Amino acid sequence: MELSEYVQRGIQTLADPGSFDSSAFALLLRAAFQSLLDAQADEAALDHPDLKHIDPVVLKHCHGAAATYILEAGKHRVDKSTLSTYLEDCKFDRERIELFCTEYQNNKNSLEILLGSIGRALPHITDVSWRLEYQIKTNQLHKMCRPGYLVTLNVENADSQSYPEISFSCSMEQLQDLVGKLKDASKSLERATQL
């Protein structure tokens, strides 16, 4: 399991009792799991009164590092002993390791389901449709009469056999920029396949 130096520093800061006391550590750990597993989770978990004494930059850094480590552990289906070994290397004490492992075991199935739903392949664009929209703003100060485009990309997701649509609105300049970038990407792919 490879983690960046930035993530490792965040995990080591989380292990430091001077930075995070026991209750702050438990709250941050639960917040990291909640932010990953609950789509409706808000940032209020980091606004808990027991976390107010911690610098917000350090708090967010450690929250992100914990979430990254949890995702990596779930991705590699790490067992308790491997998890413990890594946390010991990051200077975690026995109590924090136990809490981390317990929280991980309690959420392991949900985490694996979440990671499995993400898929292994990027969606493929199968079709595109567009229509012209005309934007008119009637205001004494600003008058905007310009065309806009509503673009819908039909994509195919190979892993889930679903066919979702991606819709967006753009100006003529943005659409020309998108078409130019797609042409460049197509040419790059053609060159790569000819090598």
Curated annotation (Swiss-Prot):
COMM domain ranges (all copies): 124-193
Subcellular location: Cytoplasm; Nucleus
Domain of life: Eukaryota
Signal peptide: none
Keyword vocabulary terms for this entry: Cytoplasm, Ion transport, Nucleus, Sodium, Sodium transport, Transcription, Transcription regulation, Transport, Ubl conjugation pathway
Family according to the record: Belongs to the COMM domain-containing protein 3 family.
Name of the protein: COMM domain-containing protein 3
